[in-house]
Regions:
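Positively charged, small/polar-rich N-terminal and surface patches that mediate targeting and assembly
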Residues: 1-112
Length: 112
């Protein structure tokens, strides 16, 4: 099993969700997060004063999948989230040792 974490632009969430649904992936956790990378922050003017906004709003999508589904899921996320501009985001893939479904006590791939 692998965990996919994708950090994307907020307005791309529906596109990514649709792309994952089209390949049969429905379970995911979505969080509003803030951060910066190469994009860095930007400057805003509020009531005549200039402020530097270091952290930019992003969306974090997490899903755990069987190994066989990972390449297709990663490609779907990239295709749906990509604008070609700085700040499109990142996709991280990590190994999950085990998973448990609390309600039924299923374990491993069947719990996902």
């Amino acid at each position: 099993m692998k965990k996919i974490e994708a950090i994307i632009k907020p307005f791309k969430l529906n596109d990514v969700k649709t792309a994952l649904n089209e390949i049969g992936i429905q379970g995911m956790t979505v969080s509003e997060v803030k951060g910066f990378g190469r994009q860095k922050g930007h400057t805003e003017i509020y009531r005549g004063s200039e402020y530097t906004v270091d952290f930019l709003p992003k969306i974090k999508i997490e899903t755990v999948l069987p190994d066989a589904q990972v390449p297709q899921a990663v490609q779907a996320i990239i295709a749906a989230a990509k604008t070609g501009k700085i700040g499109d985001g990142k996709v991280f893939v990590s190994t999950i040792d085990d998973a448990y479904r609390i309600r039924t006590e299923e374990q491993g791939d069947t719990a996902v």
